[in-house]
């Protein structure tokens, strides 16, 4: 099946450069089998989409407004099928606090948290110290790629960390620091097929470092160990958690769940990404390849699935 595929990229998100890098890979691979066109998320998007007349849209967008339900709602108004989760699923996953609230309700292992939205960073700092002590992680509520995230494993300047996170939005999420391996599990969820969880991937980093923006996207800064070096029962638990998180938020097509695993094999779920990175250093495509699915076949399956999906299908929470 040869399709006209509009690949959306860019926009004014803090992750715009990553979006374009992901889109380049998607465009190159889809172009082997389909007629593709790169369309920028800007003021000319409606004109350019209308002129191209796509069968399906692949919104390769990271962070708001491309991954939070805004673009998804726009595409639904245009009546265009698209790859990825719908408006509701995208919005729920992007809001870390709301997502974690839903995760708790279905028994998924998540850390305690504190939502900070007051203007006074010093007042917020005092409340955080009283609740969690000095060892915390501070992150923007609705942002990806670890942008604005500060880890304070030995304590530190909480007020400054709050202000750094607030450069990506007024509301900040604070969690107690949890020491563990960073691992991830991708889900592929196609219409009429059983959900597939790709092999759990462990992220190996230079000593003392974590999977921040630099280590995510600079070639050679991290190693993806597939499968992760964990006991089989822990790998099975993580795969089950990833599936349950995907279903809990009512997601579809694809997602990637991020976890920490302690030295005693305690697992905590951090967040779920509805449009995982597709760059040369990204985790989701690597895990798909480890499962025997080439990048070209992966993106082809996603667009064919999207255009074949029955319209106006509801994906209930916890489905």
Where are the regions a protein language model picked out?
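Active-site nucleotide/adenylate-binding loops and adjacent lid/helix of ATP-dependent enzymes
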Residues: 1-9, 49, 92-181, 191
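ATP-binding N-terminal substructure of ATP-dependent carboxylate-amine bond-forming enzymes
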Residues: 1-88, 92-98, 105, 117-127, ...
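Phosphate-binding site of ATP-dependent enzymes
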Residues: 153-233, 237-240, 266-268
């Amino acid at each position: 099946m040869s399709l006209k595929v509009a690949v959306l990229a860019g926009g004014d998100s803090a992750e715009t450069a990553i979006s374009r890098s992901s889109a380049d890979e998607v465009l190159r691979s889809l172009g082997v089998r389909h007629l593709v066109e790169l369309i920028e998320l800007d003021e000319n998007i409606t004109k350019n989409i209308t002129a191209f007349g796509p069968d399906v849209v692949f919104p390769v967008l990271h962070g708001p407004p491309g991954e939070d339900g805004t673009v998804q709602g726009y595409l639904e108004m245009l009546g265009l099928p698209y790859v990825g989760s719908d408006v509701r699923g995208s919005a729920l996953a992007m809001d870390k606090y709301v997502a974690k609230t839903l995760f708790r309700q279905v028994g998924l292992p998540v850390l305690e948290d504190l939502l900070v939205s007051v203007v006074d960073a010093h007042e917020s700092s005092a409340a955080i110290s009283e609740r969690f002590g000095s060892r915390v992680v501070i992150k923007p509520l609705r942002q990806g790629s670890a942008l604005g995230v500060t880890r304070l494993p030995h304590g530190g300047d909480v007020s400054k960390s709050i202000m750094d996170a607030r450069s990506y939005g007024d509301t900040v999420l604070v969690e107690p620091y949890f020491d563990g391996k960073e691992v991830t599990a991708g889900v592929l969820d196609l219409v009429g097929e059983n959900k597939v969880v790709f092999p759990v991937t462990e992220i190996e980093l230079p000593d003392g470092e974590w999977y921040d923006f630099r280590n995510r996207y600079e070639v050679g800064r991290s190693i993806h160990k597939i499968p992760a070096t964990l006991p089989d029962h822990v790998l099975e638990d993580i795969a089950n958690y990833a599936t349950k998180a995907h279903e809990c938020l009512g997601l579809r097509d694809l997602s990637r769940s991020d976890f920490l695993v302690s030295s005693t094999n305690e697992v905590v779920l951090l967040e779920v990404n509805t449009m995982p990175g597709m760059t040369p250093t990204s985790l989701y495509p690597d895990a798909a390849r480890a499962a025997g699915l080439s990048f070209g076949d992966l993106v082809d399956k996603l667009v064919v699935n999207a255009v074949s999906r029955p319209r106006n299908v509801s994906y209930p929470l916890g489905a």
